[in-house]
UniProtKB/Swiss-Prot annotation:
Catalytic activity: quinoline + A + H2O = quinolin-2(1H)-one + AH2
Role noted for this protein: Converts (3-methyl-)-quinoline to (3-methyl-)2-oxo-1,2-dihydroquinoline.
Pathway: Xenobiotic degradation; quinoline degradation
UniProt entry keywords in alphabetical sequence: 2Fe-2S, Iron, Iron-sulfur, Metal-binding, Oxidoreductase
Protein name: Quinoline 2-oxidoreductase gamma chain
Required co-factors: [2Fe-2S] cluster
EC number: 1.3.99.17
Subunit structure, interactors included: Heterohexamer of two alpha chains, two beta chains, and two gamma chains.
Organism: Comamonas testosteroni
Amino acid sequence: MIQAEKNPXL
């Protein structure tokens, strides 16, 4: 997931 960088939860 690219958005993983913006989602610390992931």
